[in-house]
Structure formats: C-alpha cells, structure tokens
Amino acid sequence: MDLAKIGAETRQIVLDVLDKAALVEGDIFVLGLSSSEVVGGHIGQNSSLEVGQVIIKTILDILEEKGIFLAVQGCEHLNRALVVEKALADKKDLEIVNVLPTLHAGGGGQLAAFQYMKDPVEVEFIVAQAGLDIGDTAIGMHVKHVQIPIRPILKELGAAHVTALASRPKLIGGARAAYTEDKIRKG
C-alpha cells in the first residue's frame, strides 16, 4: 500500500468536498472510514492503523487550518459513536460516552484520531454540516437534513469506494411547491 499516494489522494478528495459543500469556520465535518476497504479487504475485517493515521492526519491538517471540526465515526461495535475534540463536545453540549476505540472496535481512523487530536473524546450523536464516507460506512445518520450527495473528484481511495454528503436548510416552499388556494387572501 502506497501511503504517500493515499495521503495525496485524501487531500485532493477533502479539498474538493469542502469546496462543493461550502463549509465555513465552526462547521462540523464527519468522516466515516473503513481502513479495511482502503487496503482491499472487507469492511471491519482488515483494519489498518497506518492507513488510518495517514488519512486522519491529512484531514485534520486541512480542517484545522480552516477552523472546521472533525468528527470520526466508529464502527457498529461502538454504535457508530464519534471521536471529536472535547472543546467541540463542550461547545455543542454533546454527551460524552466512555469508550476507547480499538483496531477492531472503532477502527484505524478512530485510533488515529485519538493519537492526533488534542483532547479527544467519544460522543454518541452529532449533527454535521457535511461529511466524507470512505468505504461505504454509512455516515448519513450524522449529517443534518437536508442531505445532498456530492460526487468527489475521485471515486476511490485505495480500493475503497468514496462518497460524500453536504447539507442545506429545508426548503419550505419555493418555485416547485404547490399550495392550496388561500381563500382569505384571495384578491
């Protein structure tokens, strides 16, 4: 596995998704990562700390420069809990849960997040403005409504399928909406 190539492609994908999602300082970006899928294995079966480290470090460097928070989703064994900075958990009044990820419960990405974040904690729920899914991990439960699929510049990272989501406020009305006749305001 060419880790330098994984890092370079991660950077390319993240910058593209951030541009398309139009995130701003203070927003939250969720990452779902199957390092198993990146290395060509089946999700949850071939976790790689080294791959997790390269991807997390690359993403953190980009997001920290922009003032955007990272939330790293864990696997189903941790009920898809997320690693975030304690400062974010405090700011958003997120409930912290007591668990430490392992390579096979949380995964390589969560382990790397615990290594590279300043004060990492696990939270059970979050509402992010956008996110990146590397390896079909299903991040939708953590992205606010209304979710908008983004087609990243690259469709794969290593052997993993890559998708992304942005979000927008709900449109209540507008050009496509239909209304019943307003008999009170008619005329």
From Swiss-Prot:
Belongs to the UPF0340 family. This is UPF0340 protein SSA_1999. HAMAP family: UPF0340. NCBIfam families: TIGR01440 family protein. Transmembrane segments: none annotated. InterPro entries: Antibiotic_NAT-like, DUF436. Gene3D superfamilies: Hypothetical protein TT1679. It comes from the Bacteria.
